[in-house]
Amino acid sequence: MSTISINHVGLLRNPLHGKSKRASINKSWSLCLPRSSSASRLVKPCRVSSKTDTKPAEMTRRSGNYEPSLWDFDFIQSLDNHHPHVKEKQLKREEELIVEVKMLLGTKIEAVKQLELIDDLKNLGLSYFFRDEIKMVLTSIYNNFFENKNNQVGDLYFTALGFRLLRQHGFNVSQEIFDCFKNEKGSDFDETLIGEDTKATLQLYEASFHLREGENTLELARQISTKYLQKKVDEGSINDENLSSWIRHSLDLPLHWRIQRLEARWFLDAYAAREDKNPLIFELTKLDFNIIQATQQEELKEVSRWWNNSRLAEKLPFVRDRVVECYFWAVGLFDGHDYGFQRKVNAAVNILITAIDDVYDVYGTLDELRLFTDVIRRWDTQSIDQLPYYMQLCYLTLYNYVSDLAYNILKDRGINTIPHLHQSWVNTVEAYLKEAEWYESGYAPSLEEYLSIASISIGVIPIVIPLEVSIPNSTFHRRSPFEYHRYDILHLSAMVLRLADDLGTAQYEVETGDVPKAVQCYIKDTNASEEEAREHVRFMIGEVWKELNTAMAESDDCPFTEQGAWAAVNIGRAAQFIYLEGDGHGRFQIHQHMENLFFHPCV
């Protein structure tokens, strides 16, 4: 008799101990239910009935032709970067360096130097150590230079850098601060100002991606700065190699669309190459990188043990085995030492989404998928006998995971989250089923119709909801689980993820058997060329980001906590980076980033 239960593995334990600065905001949650407790009788791990051991007759099935994981279970479990005496020594030195850097932030220096220091700390992933100090410095700079819409400084570099950092930290800075850099007619930026200072043009480019709906000045800034920077790169006229490298990096994706932690090694190496680097900050960056890497390895090992014990990769060989990739996404959503629980929850959800997506996209017949969807709607264990063996395994893994997670939240927060967790999966699999029906019938939807379903099937709802309800101060459980479509931040982050995914994976997925993606739908609607269609999808991503920026600036009505909202937005950021080089699960350069982040310490 086959048993699918994740209760044997304490996935949600927090491995961090020691100083309060590194203590989790959550209590130590474990997925392991005590067998003798009343809770274990209420939410029992489900087992596949013995009468289902006979597997169905063989039939022709599609195959995703997925390659095996680059990092198997044994490799992940062999990671050993967590020596207590070494960590104690590292933490002590880290605390000393933090004190010294705080003194740097408190030193009276030029405002532009203060901004550059803060920008370095953010890019190097250190700003969470200095939140109060950074807020104090930025408040002073805002009051002295940016509160008045009439820019009295006249320095494009300072204005653009300050504008970006202030908007990142929630200050209300008007786009009119850039009006003094426009031509006499005020219709565009003064090209003589833009062309003469490459560093200032780069800062204007980065600032322009914080534009909101209706901010035409920032739209102009984005257009003209992009044109000039691309021209400089094409001509090879940038003599500073470090600056040239940074510009190429930014033209691929601006800072506002990136997640620092996913590229921590790139930013560290870029800082190391600078002649003006601060040795204290450089040492702290390397030290913190190694401490975080040790924590990430422990979390990754826990997630890997849970996945291995589920045995889905063994029993369902058609599903992708992508533990490291799924954890990489989780690191993008929640950075910092306080959110290990959320990272592990998200990694497990990503793994389940990947497996269930393969059931719908690759292996299941349409009749089986309809049965599977109906069982998930019912959310019981009495209906599973009608499912084929492989679907029983998949369903019970999902059912047990959701039940265990809900139990732990109930135990810790005293709230029942099953209705929200369950409905998040119902929404997703119903969208999966609609796409399967389209594929089976050969139906080609319009772009609008496609996105109405594909923005749900991309899986943002079951990603964000468990993260949000696990946050201690969240009140989301008081809302109806049937209102997810009303939340702009969920919808917009899903659109960025879907469109970025389609740019990275569309051709491969259509070739292996899937519904037309955004690119193909636009071609069908407009008779555009493929390059024109891809350019339109890139334009759509930019427009969605305007709406996202607006929604985050007007977050008083947001149903999510600040942490939950940022996690939702970070889904889009992670997607744009991960799909920049390919499909996010395949052979592309993204794997090198994972290697550098998780397996290679800084020396």
UniProtKB/Swiss-Prot annotation:
Compartments, record wording: Plastid, Chloroplast
Annotated Pfam families: Terpene_synth, Terpene_synth_C
Keyword Metal-binding in annotation: yes
The record's free-text note on cofactor binding: Binds 3 Mg(2+) or Mn(2+) ions per subunit.
Catalytically driven reaction(s): (2E)-geranyl diphosphate + H2O = sabinene hydrate + diphosphate
Named cofactor requirement(s): Mn(2+); Mg(2+)
Gene3D superfamilies recorded: Farnesyl Diphosphate Synthase, Terpene synthase, N-terminal domain
Span of the transit peptide along the chain: 1-47
CDD domains reported in the protein's UniProt record: Terpene_cyclase_plant_C1
Record-marked site positions (Confers reaction mechanism stereospecificity): 350
Main localization (coarse): plastid
EC number of the protein: 4.2.3.11
Pathway(s) where this gene product acts: Secondary metabolite biosynthesis; terpenoid biosynthesis
Ranges where the record places region Homodimerization: 363-369, 435-472
GO biological process: diterpenoid biosynthetic process
One cellular component (GO) term of this entry: chloroplast
Binding-site residues, Mn(2+) 3: 501, 509
GO molecular function: magnesium ion binding; protein homodimerization activity; sabinene-hydrate synthase activity; terpene synthase activity
PANTHER family: OS04G0344100 PROTEIN-RELATED (PTHR31225), TERPENE SYNTHASE 10 (PTHR31225:SF9)
Cited function: Involved in the biosynthesis of phenolic monoterpenes natural products. Monoterpene synthase which catalyzes the conversion of geranyl diphosphate (GPP) to sabinene hydrate, mainly (Z)-sabinene hydrate and to a lower extent (E)-sabinene hydrate, and the formation of minor amounts and traces of several other monoterpenes (e.g. mainly alpha-thujene, alpha-pinene and myrcene).
Domain remark text: The Asp-Asp-Xaa-Xaa-Asp/Glu (DDXXD/E) motif is important for the catalytic activity, presumably through binding to Mg(2+).
Assembly information from the UniProt record: Homodimer.
Protein family membership: Belongs to the terpene synthase family.
Protein name: Sabinene hydrate synthase, chloroplastic
Upper classification of the organism: Eukaryota, Viridiplantae, Streptophyta, Embryophyta, Tracheophyta
GN (gene name): TPS6
